[in-house]
Amino acid sequence: MNHFNQAANQWDTPEKIEQNRKYAEEIKSLAGKKEFTKILEVGCGTGLLGGQLLTSTSSLTGIDTSEGMLEVFNQKFSGNPNVHSLKVNLEQTDIEEKNFDLIISSMAFHHLQTPEKMIGKLRAKLSREGILAVIDLDKEDGTFHPDPVKMGVHHSGFAREEIESWAKKNDLHVQIKIINIIHKNDKQYPVFLAIFSH
């Protein structure tokens, strides 16, 4: 993911920081919980979202395929012994850790080849009361990313029926809510939050 390695150092703009603060509040609101103790962030990037959900008593594991992003992630949380990262492609391999009460993934699922299988893999990592929160684009016309191939994009967002089918096939409940509208290319791109639970 060369694009993300190059973009890593300029990734944390004030706009993105504020956006992820709002996303974190939406997750807590929809999940009906204010705090989480063991968090896994899939496609963590620089930890923009995970960092917003981290408390003094919680741990955060960030996984990503981009070395550049993980470098920034590690620098950002270097003083916190409860935060660590792994360079892992979760579609090709696995991690030993489990029993997370919150698994989050923001704007990463459109980079996956088989999102439905990933839901199943992450379901196995949840604690009994754990939730999986996925944030991504609503189905769009393919214009959101300027160069989808170069940027490793496999899906132009996701339709509501698709998300519901992931839940059904993995025996999970799902709540879906539009939490943002991104304005670019003279268009509006809705962003959803899907909360999966047992």
Model-derived features with residue positions:
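A conserved beta-strand element that flanks and buttresses the S-adenosyl-L-methionine
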Residues: 104
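C-terminal lobe and adjacent flexible extensions of AdoMet/dcAdoMet transferase-like proteins
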Residues: 194-198
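C-terminal alpha-helical "lid/dimerization" subdomain adjacent to the S-adenosyl-L-methionine
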Residues: 14-18, 49, 133-188
